[in-house]
Amino acid sequence: MVANFLLSRVLDRFPKLKVVFAESSLGWGAYEIEYADYQSDADGLPSEGYTLKPSELFQRQCYFTCWYDRMSLRVRRYLGSANILWSSHFPLATSPWPNTRQHADLSFVDVPEQEKRRILWENAAKLYSL
């Protein structure tokens, strides 16, 4: 779904549009972006008027959410921490509530403080003008 969206020209036509792919896994999302870039090159899309690669469109306008696993956060090195939003997943049964803070601390144990702040709240504050 993400690859198809990135190849659809929607982001080219609406460069101020911001898109959040919620309920997604960062690992799965990274694959979709890599696939979109591969497909773009294989199909010769740059010669058809595409001005940016799908991964560049994603970096400019899109976000993924993450919420539970440390493995996904390793993918931030590929995606860039500026495009990741943390979700508590509340009120779903898979939410770490009422131990949300402890869960976040465990999830972000290997993440540098600046990136942790960015993912946990700064990206959302910027995106939603809070």
Place the predicted regions along the sequence by residue.
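Histidine/acidic residue-rich metal-binding segments in metalloenzymes
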Residues: 1-57, 71-82
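Generic secondary-structure boundary/loop-capping signal
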Residues: 2, 87-89
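Mid-to-C-terminal alpha-helical segments outside catalytic/metal-binding sites
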Residues: 8-9, 17, 27-28, 51, ...
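Surface-exposed cleft-lining segments at the edges of enzyme active sites
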Residues: 58-62
